[in-house]
């Protein structure tokens, strides 16, 4: 039996009280995908939104993993230079100016 069968609603709703909500119901995030009300809590996955940018497919939102990792490493005083290799692989999306507003346009 499944532990959680949430369908397409999104598991971010399970932690919604730890995030400020946007008008569209998605969490408000810092530029590093961190909660603006619960320091140290990061969101990864298809519920990540920045302005009108939607990271709905795994190949889009996984480009944000290194951004989160760098933020965590930096906050712990750990070196994060090795994460730059992800940029070379096209897996480090910190410049959202290249993204359109549609789901698959980053």
Protein language model annotation of sequence segments:
Residues 1-92, 96-106:
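Flavin (primarily FAD) cofactor-binding/catalytic cores of flavoenzymes
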């Amino acid at each position: 039996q499944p532990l959680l069968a949430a369908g397409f609603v999104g598991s971010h709703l399970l932690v919604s009280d730890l995030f400020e909500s946007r008008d569209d119901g998605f969490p408000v995030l810092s530029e590093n995908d961190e909660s603006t009300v619960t320091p140290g809590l990061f969101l990864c996955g298809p519920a990540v939104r920045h302005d009108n940018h939607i990271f709905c497919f795994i190949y889009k939102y996984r480009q944000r993993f290194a951004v989160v990792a760098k933020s965590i490493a930096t906050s712990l005083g750990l070196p994060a230079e090795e994460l730059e290799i992800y940029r070379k692989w096209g897996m480090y999306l910190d410049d959202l100016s290249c993204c359109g507003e549609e789901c698959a346009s980053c």
